[in-house]
From Swiss-Prot:
One of its GO terms (biological process) is pyrimidine nucleobase biosynthetic process. Orotate binds at residues 117, 145. This is Orotate phosphoribosyltransferase. Pathway: Pyrimidine metabolism; UMP biosynthesis via de novo pathway; UMP from orotate: step 1/2. Coiled coil: none annotated. Its cofactor is Mg(2+). The keyword Glycosyltransferase applies. Homodimer. Keywords: Glycosyltransferase, Magnesium, Pyrimidine biosynthesis, Transferase. It catalyses: orotidine 5'-phosphate + diphosphate = orotate + 5-phospho-alpha-D-ribose 1-diphosphate. Transmembrane segments: none annotated. HAMAP family: PyrE (MF_01208).
Length: 173
């Protein structure tokens, strides 16, 4: 069931834009969900953190750098839980870490993400966490664009949950 308050907040913040847009995976779309709008709007961010907090349970939180860091940080404050940040690749300086923050081997981790299109960035984050010893079987996104992410994640034994779907967000438009 759609979170109508969140849908209204995303629309009111003008996080959904219409036109011709190139997406990160190379495809194009007639609409764009601008994560930077909803991640920098305190009202949207609060609603997202509340909704994530209702779903994460006792799992350690993880966010994919850079896009999901505000989301995981706000959720961590809401749940009073520590979190980790997963980089796209290992740093070439300092500690050289790909994962920042601590977790125990075998610990259950849930990945929070902004928008899922193909799901590849979430898959990459889950694989990095699994290689580091975490138990990860779930990704929660703000918006599922319904363009194959759910199926792609399922191929990696990862369940995709979304706060809203593109169908929800674009209904009545």
């Amino acid at each position: 069931m759609a979170n109508q308050e969140l849908i209204d907040a995303l629309r009111d913040a003008e996080a959904v834009k219409f036109g011709e847009f190139e997406l990160s995976h190379g495809g194009t779309s007639e609409y764009y969900v601008d994560k930077y709008v909803f991640e920098t709007d305190p009202g949207c961010l609060r609603q997202i953190a509340d909704a994530f907090a209702d779903r994460v349970g006792d799992a350690k939180l993880a966010g994919v750098a850079l896009g999901a860091v505000p989301l995981v940080a706000a959720t961590a404050v809401e749940t009073d839980s520590p979190y980790v940040i997963v980089r796209k690749q290992k740093k070439e300086y300092g500690t050289g870490n790909q994962i920042e923050g601590d977790f125990d081997a075998g610990e259950e981790v849930v990945v929070l993400e902004d928008i899922a299109t193909t799901g590849q960035s979430a898959i990459d984050a889950v694989e990095a966490l699994r290689e580091a010893g975490a138990t990860v079987d779930r990704v929660i996104v703000v918006v599922d664009r319904e363009e194959g992410a759910r199926e792609n994640l399922a191929e990696h034994d990862i369940e995709l949950e979304s706060l809203v779907t593109a169908s929800d967000l674009l209904a009545d438009r």
